[in-house]
């Protein structure tokens, strides 16, 4: 039985993410910046993989991001700014970028560029 196009794309993304996760791991000094993108929102977390904790998180669901005028890319930029601010507050300046199997472009690239411009290095 043939799969739908959306199922095939989801499975391909999960395979890409699995390949990435074999190579990426976050530590307390350099946590993993994990991105999840849905059709409407974008979520990002700083994860310490050694003890399985989330150091900081930001999402487009938050009230100050929902009020951003513009499209989803503008909201992604604001989420990138927020995660950089929260990382600085937690004493983190370098991260490992985990794009979650998504292609590096559009909202993912906008979030990463905004985080870099606001002080995160990866």
UniProtKB/Swiss-Prot annotation:
Q: Which GO terms describe its molecular function?
A: 5S rRNA binding; structural constituent of ribosome
Is Glycoprotein set as a keyword in this record?
no
Q: Which GO terms describe its cellular component?
A: cytosolic large ribosomal subunit
Which InterPro entries does this entry report, sorted A to Z? Ribosomal_uL18_bac-type, Ribosomal_uL18_bac/euk
- Keywords of the record: Ribonucleoprotein, Ribosomal protein, RNA-binding, rRNA-binding
| Signal peptide (from-to) | none
- UniProt-listed GO biological process terms: translation
Keyword presence, Ribonucleoprotein: yes
CDD domains linked to this entry: Ribosomal_L18_L5e
| HAMAP family from the UniProt entry | Ribosomal_uL18_B
Spell out the subunit comment: Part of the 50S ribosomal subunit; part of the 5S rRNA/L5/L18/L25 subcomplex. Contacts the 5S and 23S rRNAs.
Function, in words: This is one of the proteins that bind and probably mediate the attachment of the 5S RNA into the large ribosomal subunit, where it forms part of the central protuberance.
Family membership:
Belongs to the universal ribosomal protein uL18 family.
Q: What is this protein called?
A: Large ribosomal subunit protein uL18
Q: What's the source species for this entry?
A: Mycobacterium tuberculosis (strain ATCC 25177 / H37Ra)
